[in-house]
A protein has these predicted regions:
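Sequence/structural signature of beta-propeller domains
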Residues: 1-236
């Protein structure tokens, strides 16, 4: 059911504490808003995913096929603005997927919306025994399907060519206009695969130690040991 939603202007060019207070006082809290995309056929419609659900029992119910693997199906949302060029006029917010659908989505991460009306969703299970997939949600009727899946021989601990259980795809875009030939009705997507395998780095380069975390004010309260790990493991 669409829910009427209002927007307020938040001053972003300020210090972190002021920004956080303003956001808390005027905003709505979601569990990890991760990525969003405008509908190319409707400039007033915006789709986005939340990677987690704040431990919602529906979204975190185990996949019957892999009952021992933890899961969070997050959610897919749609914002329909009265006028996207003037968001202060308001919008309607809808939850399209609640994470409990039979496809048993796990950690929806990045998305795109194709010209033929499909939301493409990439999973990032995050160091989890679930093998990551690329999922399609057809806007017209809500049908779900798996478009692609990582090869289990590389990404399950018992696989014959095991590398890691920390794999994801990211950055999906619709490149049909670049690749399709006249008369071709296929949809073409481009994405990358992120295989999180350490490259043998055991310590951070002194020249860049702290350079990453120092530029992330949201990490300033992180323990020093965690900051060191980020500096080391940023190279994969």
């Amino acid at each position: 059911t669409p829910t009427a939603t209002t927007f307020k202007k938040i001053e972003w060019n300020t210090d972190v504490d002021t920004f956080h207070k303003s956001s808390r006082d005027n905003g709505t809290t979601f569990a990890r808003v991760e990525d969003g995309q405008w509908d190319p056929k409707n400039p007033n419609v915006f789709y986005f995913v939340t990677t987690e659900s704040n431990k919602d029992p529906i979204a975190t119910a185990p996949n019957p096929a892999t009952p021992d693997v933890t899961r969070d199906g997050g959610a897919l949302w749609r914002l329909t603005f009265k006028d996207a060029q003037n968001p202060l006029l308001g919008a309607n917010l809808e939850m399209l997927l609640n994470g409990g659908e039979s496809i048993m989505m796990s950690k929806p991460d990045n998305i795109t919306v194709t010209n033929n009306g499909v939301v493409v969703i990439q999973e990032d299970p995050g160091g989890n025994a679930h093998v990551a997939r690329v999922i399609a949600y057809r806007i017209s009727d809500g049908k779900l399907a798996t478009l692609a899946k990582f090869d289990s021989q590389y990404f399950t601990a018992t696989g014959s060519k095991y590398m890691t259980i920390d794999e994801e795809s990211s950055g999906v875009i619709d490149v049909t206009s670049l690749l399709a030939k006249p008369g071709d009705t296929n949809t073409y997507l481009m994405l990358n695969a992120q295989i999180h395998v350490k490259g043998g780095v055991t310590k951070a380069d002194p020249a860049v130690t702290g350079a990453l975390t120092a530029r992330r004010p949201d990490l300033r309260n992180m323990p020093s040991s965690s900051k060191k790990r980020i500096d080391i493991e940023a190279i994969e």
